[in-house]
Structure formats: C-alpha cells, structure tokens
Amino acid sequence: GAGGVGGYGMQICKSRKATVITTCSAKNEEYVKALGADHVIDYQNEDVLDRIQEITNGRGVDSVQSAVDIDTANQGIQGLCFGGGISCIAGLPSLSEKTFEKAISVHKIALGGAHTSNNYDAQTDLANMAKELMSLVVDGEVSPMVTDLIKLEDIPKGLERLETRHVKGKIVAEIE
C-alpha cells in the first residue's frame, strides 16, 4: 500500500478507472487514500481476507499486486476471484489444488532482469513502460511520491530504511 511499488500500482490502476483495495497500517490510511485507494484494510488490526470478501460481496478481487513477501503473496492468492491474477515481485505464492480450481494466473515480475537478460525485446518493453509512467507523472495523473530528499552521503542510511520495508513513498538522493 504505502510503499513505492504499491503507491505507483494504485495510481496506475486509478488512472485506468479501476477500484483499488489496498492494505497498510492505520498511520498510512490517509496517505494511500490520497494516492487513490477506494478501500483501505489495516493489515495489523483487520482480517485482510474477511475484509476483501466483505468489500467484494464474496466475489474476491480480479487482481493482486504482491510486493512484500511470499506470505503476503499466499494471502493475496486466497483473495482472488475465479479467473483472477496475481503479480509478484518479492516471491511467488504456493500453488495448491485449491488454487488451480480458481483458474488464476500467476506472474513473476523481474523488471531489473530485462537489463541482465541481453534480450532486446525485454529491454525495449521496459523502456516503453518507463516512458509511459513518466508521461503519467508529467501529466499529473501519477505522483512521483517523493517523501524524503536525502544527501549523497546519507544513501547508506536510506538503503537501511528501505530494507525495513516500512518506507512510505520514495527516497530520492540529491547529487550535487
């Protein structure tokens, strides 16, 4: 929800007129609403799957973006509707027979892999995605979510903060 990947994901979905359900801690609720979340689930104090069922009238969600870990991906896959899909950047969920009954699709996202793949088509696709995202930022449809501007010498501290996976928005280093 409140992290960089989730924040961009929410905004892109809203730019495509999707209904967005996200999870975050209570302290970040207003922040994610400002980014476009229609429904916010406090993952620390609410049962995420129960809330998804409540919000979707028992149907489940069409799509899940999992950017945290395998446990979150496993929870996300349970919240999908029949024919839904999950995109994961931080570990794939466990696939069981029950999962296959839902006819879901699972996508492992490795954007950085395009750079090391020596696959020109993958690199071109990544460049086109970046170009489209930048157009959305320039047009004001997507916020760059810069929440912290740090100096070059503070990059190690910024990276330590990112490792906690509790950074809101994006940390940007100012290089003079």
Residue ranges, per PLM feature:
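Mid-domain Rossmann-like dinucleotide-binding core that forms the NAD(H)/NADP(H) cofactor-binding site
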Residues: 1-45
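Local beta-strand N-terminus motif with an aromatic residue
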Residues: 37, 57-61, 142, 155
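C-terminal substrate-binding/catalytic core of Rossmann-like NAD(P)-dependent dehydrogenases/reductases
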Residues: 98-148
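C-terminal capping/lid region of NAD(P)-dependent oxidoreductase domains
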Residues: 138-148, 156-176
